Curated annotation (Swiss-Prot):
Gene3D superfamilies: Cysteine-tRNA ligase, C-terminal anti-codon recognition domain, HUPs. Monomer. This is Cysteine--tRNA ligase. It comes from Limosilactobacillus reuteri (strain DSM 20016) (Lactobacillus reuteri). ATP binds at K274.
Length: 470
């Protein structure tokens, strides 16, 4: 039974989609004014992994993730670069698609843009005005937060506490327009020279929160199964989405809210963000780090937990991935001399691993326990591959299971070239050196023995480890 932690109820709940066998899932996408950084990628990877697991369990997943292609940040960035807002959006949407493809994130079923849905946004805002939930003022349109009885339910904050915080962030201009400090913009009047659209309230553009309400309900329906994003979106963005959507449709907006933990960096574990200027873009890091390693590093931490980004943690991920790849290569190598022996014992054991993996992942997508099962499977694979007589059917069954489970983490397992290259040997020697330093002699011997099977002999000398090919 799959359970998911629902931010709205603050507890794990059995996952039951509205329509059996189909999951409608919306993930808040980026504001496309710059390259995505590692923190943005964490959200994309976390929920791509959720999607992959749902598909693994047999669900058809309608996965919608938007692009915010007009807002204050985009207007500012376009002016700084001397290009139009649409040109800026096109530049960074293309970059997003390239970067996410590099880290093996499946394209969404739909990637709608805010600017493609202006007509629907205006209609949605008009509906809220007619119902008394919104009011126009000098070209802007604001939402009456207090009119929505459940405002604050997602973030668990009282209206009084929210009012104190909101009062501190209301500009002088907004003081004269808003009926209440809690009210937020649905539509913003255009300033001179800004990109804008005609509306019943004059030229303007949509507010950020209304974009996601409109696009999620337009493409997935009035009630969606999963709405996901980073923890920083819980309030005000997702809180406001609930208020807007449920006021307009009169129906429950989202059945399960999922929020991923932050990526932290530095000795003080600061949240990685553009505002703190401590971010690293995916565009830059994949020039130095194997994209599969970055993906594996991100995908193997449970989505609600924070991730500490560091070179040491990346190195650990590299070593663990090498360990899995080496086991896969050993199996491939043994296919050459495998016989047609019995496979039943192996397939029975694989069923146990498969069930163990599902049990782990069914617990709120617990990838850390899931990958622990993969490591157990790898250990079993290595022991089997070292036997004198192996079955071809068994070898292929183990490989198939490894490929299937690793694909859920977004990692492609493929056989390396039969002739192991020098770079790979050096990586394994370095991994062996670390294992010996940590007194992990079992892993050290495993690397040495696996290389020997591939015709590589290691020699430990006072000057370091050398190797030769038989």
């Amino acid at each position: 039974m799959l359970t998911i932690y629902n931010t709205l109820t603050r507890k794990k709940e059995e996952f039951k989609p509205l329509h059996p066998g189909v999951v409608n899932m919306y993930v808040c996408g980026p504001t496309v004014y710059n390259y995505i950084h590692i923190g943005n990628a964490r959200s994309a990877i976390a929920f791509d992994t959720v999607r992959r697991y749902l598909e693994f369990k047999g669900y058809k997943v309608n996965y919608v993730s938007n692009f915010t292609d007009v807002d204050d940040k985009m207007i500012k960035a376009a002016a700084e670069q001397g290009i139009t807002v649409p040109q800026l959006a096109e530049k960074y949407i293309n970059a997003f698609m390239e970067d996410t493809a590099a880290i093996n994130i499946e394209p969404a079923t739909l990637h709608p843009r805010a600017t493609e849905n202006i007509t629907e946004i205006i209609k949605f805002v008009q509906g809220l005005i007619e119902k008394g939930y919104a009011y126009p003022k000098d070209g802007d349109v604001y939402y009456r937060a207090r009119k929505f009885n459940h405002y604050g339910q997602l973030s668990g904050q009282s209206l009084d506490d929210l009012e104190v915080g909101a009062s501190e962030h209301v500009s002088a201009d907004e003081v004269n327009k808003k009926e209440d400090p809690l009210d937020f913009a649905l539509w913003k009047a255009a300033k001179p020279g800004e990109i804008s659209w005609d509306s019943p309230w004059g030229k303007g553009r949509p507010g950020w929160h209304i974009e996601c309400s409109v696009m999620s309900t337009k493409y997935l329906g009035k009630t969606i199964d999963i709405h996901a994003g980073g923890q920083d979106l819980e309030f005000p963005h997702h809180e406001n989405e609930i208020a807007q959507s449920e006021a307009e449709t009169g129906q429950k907006f989202v059945r399960y809210w999922m929020h991923n933990g932050f990526v932290t960096i530095g000795k003080d574990n600061e949240k990685m963000s553009k505002s703190l200027h401590n971010f690293i873009t995916v565009h830059e890091i994949i020039k130095e780090v194997d994209p599969q390693v970055l993906r594996f590093f991100m995908a193997t931490t449970q989505y609600r937990r924070p991730i500490q980004y560091s070179q040491a943690n990346l190195t650990d991920a590299q070593n663990n991935l090498n360990h899995i790849q080496t086991a896969f290569d050993n199996l491939t190598y043994r296919e050459q001399d495998a016989d047609e022996g019995d496979v039943q014992e192996v397939t029975d054991r694989l069923e146990q691993f498969h069930h163990q993996f599902i049990t782990a992942m069914d617990d709120d997508i617990n990838v850390q326990n899931g990958i622990a099962t993969v490591y157990e499977l790898v250990k079993y694979a290595n022991v089997y591959a070292q036997q004198d007589n192996v079955s071809l059917g068994a070898i292929q069954a183990i490989k198939k299971e490894l490929v299937e489970l690793m694909s859920i983490f977004g990692v492609k397992l493929e056989a390396s070239d039969n002739q192991i290259n020098d770079e790979k040997i050096k990586q394994l020697i370095e991994e062996r050196n670390i294992a010996r330093k940590n007194k992990d002699f079992a892993r050290s011997d495993e690397i040495r023995d696996n290389l020997k099977k591939q015709g590589i002999i290691l020699e430990d000398t006072p000057q370091g480890t050398r190797y030769k090919k038989e």
